[in-house]
């Protein structure tokens, strides 16, 4: 399997750069994805990006990483399979057992990511359904958190792959 990472962004992250810039900054998701592709290329890693405001679509995409899911046929090539997942699940972090279960089912190492420091915000944001299953959690680093997650994933994959 090639060193491929899937970057998932959940609900409202398509509004980065517009929504509450005093919390989330002015960098857009498009900017983040462009930077992610460039950085991944420099690190010798392929990266796929996916954003959805819909929980089921995110669950489907996670399942596809293992060759499963409603949109995968037995004749499909494993083109959507990955070695690691970086996920900013947005509000689904605090509510979605379905996303947690999908990540646990595929058993692919994942990094949980948040642009803001969720522990310095409303109390409900401090609880994550994902953290105890993640190999790493990054929060409060703004858009730079994506770069840190990609670097970590690339190094983790290199260690695992050698």
From Swiss-Prot:
InterPro entries listed in its UniProt record: DHquinase_II, DHquinase_II_CS, DHquinase_II_sf
Keywords: Lyase, Quinate metabolism
Site-annotated residues for Transition state stabilizer: 19
Residues at the catalytic site: 24, 114
CDD domains to which the protein is assigned, alphabetical: DHQase_II
One GO BP annotation of this record: quinate catabolic process
Superkingdom in the source lineage: Eukaryota
Xref: PANTHER family: CATABOLIC 3-DEHYDROQUINASE
Assembly and oligomerization: Homododecamer. Adopts a ring-like structure, composed of an arrangement of two hexameric rings stacked on top of one another.
Name of the featured protein: Catabolic 3-dehydroquinase
